[in-house]
Amino acid sequence: MAVAINKKMITVQGVNIQCFDAGNGAATIVLLHGAGVDSAMMSWAEVMRILGENYRVIAPDLPGYGGSDSIDGEYTLGFYTETVKGIIEAFQCPPVVLVGLSLGGGISLNMALNYPELIRLLIPVDAWGLFPKLPYHRLTHWYTRSKLNDNLYQWTGKYPAIVRWSLAYNLFGDKSKVTEALVEEVRDAMLEPEAGKPFISFQRSEITRTGLNTDLYSRLGEIAMPTLLIHGSKDKAVPLKDALAASKLIPNCQLHIMEGCRHWPQKERPEEFARVVRDFIAGQNL
């Protein structure tokens, strides 16, 4: 029988958060999506249905994304970390298996460093923060503060061919996985009035001229819980070399490389992704 995914609104720090909840089991998995115009269901729907066969799985829309509220202040890594802490506490389910993709991976790393008591196992996926600097860091610093970045999402969303190319070039190794339905889903998100603004705020708060405002990289050796890094071998946003280096810095760490994948491995091959997560959890006797 197909796993039902239920929608629930909760309030954390005065912000309404849309959450998706599925399955049942001894372990609870919390899935954090990425940035741009991502959302819980855009990133995690397929994986959630598979993992929900064995575990309870919770996936929130982060503030500013999907069906959750926007805020008037800055979308900093610290703000998102406190939000995720509040979500876990609201569901009364700690300690959890925390899985974070890209931006969500950075949040998960920061959670592990600041609230280790809430996390049983850590699974960063193509994660923000595995590096001291971004590729082409100074150029990226300039771009994030430019008008080009301000207008990128609404402009790109007008042109299906550009959306399709961007997904194939940046997120998927297997171009056949870029379906018309996915192109339309991403376009719809890009054409929302506030599209991209939370991520732009995050970029401007975290990317300094010389590095990152929140230095996760230098603290990777402090992560205490068993950790599994999952990474696409062809990721352009977070190159594989960063995951390889991080896997040697995190004390109790395994690395699974998804060959041929780019920055959205869980979307490209959800069955493999879910199997790797299940095997990791089983190996920890949960």
Language-model regions, residue ranges each:
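Alpha/beta-hydrolase fold catalytic core
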Residues: 1-31, 52-55, 93-94, 278-286
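Active-site loop/oxyanion-hole signature of alpha/beta-hydrolase fold enzymes
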Residues: 20, 45, 49, 55, ...
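Active-site glycine-rich loops that stabilize anionic/oxyanionic intermediates
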Residues: 26, 34-38, 102
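The serine-hydrolase catalytic nucleophile loop
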Residues: 36-46
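Flexible "cap/lid" loop of the alpha/beta hydrolase fold
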Residues: 113, 121-155
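Conserved alpha/beta-hydrolase catalytic His-Asp/Glu region
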Residues: 156-219
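Short beta-strand/loop motif that positions the catalytic acidic residue
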Residues: 223, 229-231
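Catalytic active-site module of serine/aspartate enzymes centered on a nucleophile-bearing elbow/loop
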Residues: 253-286
